[in-house]
């Protein structure tokens, strides 16, 4: 490292504890592959401050804002995509994207495209438009997941009813009636590789009964899912953002 530094040769240097332990090598691999991939694409980051990644690239479409992973710059690689539908302003989006990229940098999860879809818009149509118009997206059921907030679960239900779009779904403070709950179960249960569900109820939610009903119906149908009812009031609805990302990305990469 000192010789490379003295000769001003671009490189990366990182000290890890663990020696020859497999876990040490395994956690180092993602960054090693990224380094090699950047070299192939003629983009070598090295240790210099001037070569640090630029601001996260994003694309604005009619009904969504799409953020690409930092690793996508200068690369032809295609990535899985996680859709998030609800009332989320631009500042909040950037905070969530930054948290996600930090998780990737810390090797907690894998890179993915994040697409924030406007509330109460046709989800299926929006997905179709995004994946036809934009490159760098692995548009398949196994590589696609959804986080839905409040009454936007109805858009998610319609999307699943039309076709099996998602490998995993996180429903946060879902709002609906008994028919919506029944429709969700029918939609999920109609696919052999059904989307796994994470049901999240935060203390401020006034629709505890609806989410509980979904949980009971999923359990009665013997469908694998997660159910979280939080007791402590948190600062904002995205306190458990990392939990949701890990759940969905693990579903994508099983």
PLM features per residue range, with description:
Residues 1-254:
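Non-catalytic cap/lid and distal C-terminal segments of serine-dependent acyl enzymes
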């Amino acid at each position: 490292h000192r010789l490379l530094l003295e000769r001003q040769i671009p490189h990366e240097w990182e000290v890890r504890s663990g020696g020859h332990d497999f876990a040490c090598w395994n956690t180092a691999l993602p960054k090693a592959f990224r380094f090699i991939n950047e070299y192939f694409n003629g983009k070598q980051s090295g240790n210099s401050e001037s070569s640090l990644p630029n601001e996260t690239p994003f694309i604005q479409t009619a009904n969504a804002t799409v953020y690409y992973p930092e690793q996508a710059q200068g690369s032809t690689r295609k990535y899985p995509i996680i859709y998030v539908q609800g009332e989320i302003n631009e500042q909040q989006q950037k905070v969530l994207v930054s948290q996600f990229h930090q998780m990737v940098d810390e090797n907690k999860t894998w890179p993915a495209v994040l697409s924030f879809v406007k509330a109460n818009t046709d989800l299926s149509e929006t997905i179709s438009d995004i994946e036809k118009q934009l490159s760098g997206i692995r548009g398949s059921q196994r590589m696609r997941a959804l986080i839905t907030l409040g009454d936007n679960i109805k858009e998610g239900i319609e999307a699943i009813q039309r076709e099996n779009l998602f490998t995993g779904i996180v429903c946060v403070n879902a709002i609906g009636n008994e028919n919506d709950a029944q429709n969700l179960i029918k939609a999920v249960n109609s696919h052999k590789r059904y989307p796994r569900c994470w049901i999240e109820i935060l203390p401020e939610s006034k629709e505890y009964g609806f989410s509980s009903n979904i949980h009971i119906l999923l359990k009665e149908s013997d469908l694998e899912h997660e159910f979280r009812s939080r007791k402590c009031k948190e600062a904002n609805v995205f306190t458990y953002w990392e939990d949701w990302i890990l759940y969905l990305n693990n579903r994508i990469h099983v």
